[in-house]
Amino acid sequence: MPGIPLVSRETSSCSRSTEQMCHEDSRLRISEEEEIAAEESLAAYCKPVELYNIIQRRAIRNPLFLQRCLHYKIEAKHKRRIQMTVFLSGAIDAGVQTQKLFPLYILLARLVSPKPVAEYSAVYRFSRACILTGGLGVDGVSQAQANFLLPDMNRLALEAKSGSLAILFISFAGAQNSQFGIDSGKIHSGNIGGHCLWSKIPLQSLYASWQKSPNMDLGQRVDTVSLVEMQPCFIKLKSMSEEKCVSIQVPSNPLTSSSPQQVQVTISAEEVGSTEKSPYSSFSYNDISSSSLLQIIRLRTGNVVFNYRYYNNKLQKTEVTEDFSCPFCLVKCASFKGLRYHLPSTHDLLNFEFWVTEEFQAVNVSLKTETMISKVNEDDVDPKQQTFFFSSKKFRRRRQKSQVRSSRQGPHLGLGCEVLDKTDDAHSVRSEKSRIPPGKHYERIGGAESGQRVPPGTSPADVQSCGDPDYVQSIAGSTMLQFAKTRKISIERSDLRNRSLLQKRQFFHSHRAQPMALEQVLSDRDSEDEVDDDVADFEDRRMLDDFVDVTKDEKQMMHMWNSFVRKQRVLADGHIPWACEAFSRLHGPIMVRTPHLIWCWRVFMVKLWNHGLLDARTMNNCNTFLEQLQI
């Protein structure tokens, strides 16, 4: 089981709840015999762990859909991105009211071409525009703000060095009352243009300030204050599907009547992926003292303590997994809640108890004794090791031919002829012997050459009179009656014993793989709907005999193919190439002896090839194999 073993709790100062959650084995003093028994108890974890390891290795190449989705979610959650927030923090020029700037549009735009396009000085492309409509709040800080999600620092460095990204500020101050302005409510509709105020902040300068700040590496917020000067310009908006373009034309002689306004803007940046990680998450466990190891493990988010209890929950082994990982299948569950759902549903051979405190997230693991220990019946015999026979229909036992023949020959028949077959099970023989009265046991009289058995107290004269057929029939009839009663009781007891054994076992349907009730198991109805091959072949031949426009060889070939497809369960189109090669190897010797069958088979493969069910390579392999058989 993977994980980081914890040190002894005697060297750490933990609370009482933590001690109860993560105590070690070293505190319990046990003898050598108890230590051996404890090791055997701990070894019981090997079987379920080996099973889960096999399942985990099989799932490496083809992981489950839910685990793939969870993996993508975890990657997106821990991906380092920058959350940028832009808002107005005040105005320096008191001559012009800041309220006139609203509504103010803030765009994160990319420069399409650094060269001027026609009469426009710059063309930017953006996806969405944030609108600030409210005024300044307390201390001159705007209550409305614009949020943008930037890529990670490495990718942002390339974008910043290129100088293509910039934050645009566009205001239609007084544009609705001006003959040169445009309606701010129509900025999202179609191609429009007009006069406005604008300014920009290159992202390159912001990235330089963020890179110098030590708070960015620690996952803390970085605030940058900038002064933007709103300049008059003429813009034209053009919408193209999801992306929009804004073309800006700065006049060579701007109007002097309207003085430019400087606005103080605050830009906050914070890494989203790193805020959920502790600063201790970047530390490694190497070169760390034992006393400091527990403190770092405690502060690391995503670390879960697993306590494996054994020896009647008196001892336990403790280990730690990272990133909310499962210790059995190594699946990262993204959170402790996800781990709580994953463990009971996926690893049902174990019991799990979840603990959450201010210092630790722990899981107590124990074995399910009802699944690991096999059930024992009344005779202390494991039913898995005991062989028994069951039949839903009672069958009649027949005497062997030698016994029937000897019943007609009186002198060669002993009074103690065996009625039960030798195929009776040992339980029936023992029960029959226990049911026969002591006076009915037979003794051998007259030596081994006589071959006759008589009950005790029988005189030799009576033995000599056994040659009488009437006497033999009367004695045999009474003996048969006695043994028939004993045999009936034995069979009934055997059925009861087999029924009790069946009740302790769980049977599953061979097709649906669903548990079956005992009534379904004992019923005479065939729930599997199995088709007898002989009956199916007979019906197939009868159906083919009705065809009048095909030859005898074609009928035989169709019958061979239908029988092969039914027995081998060829159901999908992808099974056809394999089925053709297997059919050629199975029926190749028969087709070689009858050349007409080979031609019928080749014509059939050509038809499959015309329908796209068989490739040329497989057809060539089949013909090559048949040619080798002909040689």
From Swiss-Prot:
Residues 424-465 are annotated as: Disordered. Residues 505-583 are annotated as: VEFS-box. In plants, PcG complexes are probably composed of a member of the EZ family (CLF or MEA), FIE, and a member of the VEFS family (FIS2, VRN2 or EMF2). Binds to ALP1. GO terms for molecular function: chromatin DNA binding; DNA binding; DNA-binding transcription factor activity; transcription cis-regulatory region binding; zinc ion binding. PANTHER family: POLYCOMB GROUP PROTEIN, POLYCOMB GROUP PROTEIN EMBRYONIC FLOWER 2-RELATED. GO terms for cellular component: nucleus. The keyword Nucleus applies. One of its GO terms (biological process) is negative regulation of flower development. PROSITE patterns: ZINC_FINGER_C2H2_1. Widely expressed throughout the life cycle with higher levels in proliferating tissues. Expressed in both vegetative and the reproductive shoot meristems. It is found in: Nucleus. The gene is EMF2. It comes from Arabidopsis thaliana. Polycomb group (PcG) protein. Involved in flowering processes by repressing unknown target genes and preventing reproductive development. Participates in polycomb group (PcG) protein complex-mediated (probably in complex with EMF1) silencing of the flower homeotic genes AGAMOUS (AG), PISTILLATA (PI), and APETALA3 (AP3), as well as of some regulatory genes such as ABSCISIC ACID INSENSITIVE3 (ABI3), LONG VEGETATIVE PHASE1 (LOV1), and FLOWERING LOCUS C (FLC) during vegetative development, by mediating trimethylation of histone 3 lysine 27 on the AG chromatin (H3K27me3). A zinc finger (C2H2-type) spans 324-347. InterPro entries: EMF2-like_DUF7651, Polycomb_protein_VEFS-Box. Belongs to the VEFS (VRN2-EMF2-FIS2-SU(Z)12) family. Keywords: Chromatin regulator, Developmental protein, Differentiation, Flowering, Metal-binding, Nucleus, Repressor, Transcription, Transcription regulation, Zinc, Zinc-finger. This is Polycomb group protein EMBRYONIC FLOWER 2. Its main location: nucleus. Residues 424-446 have a biased composition (Basic and acidic residues).
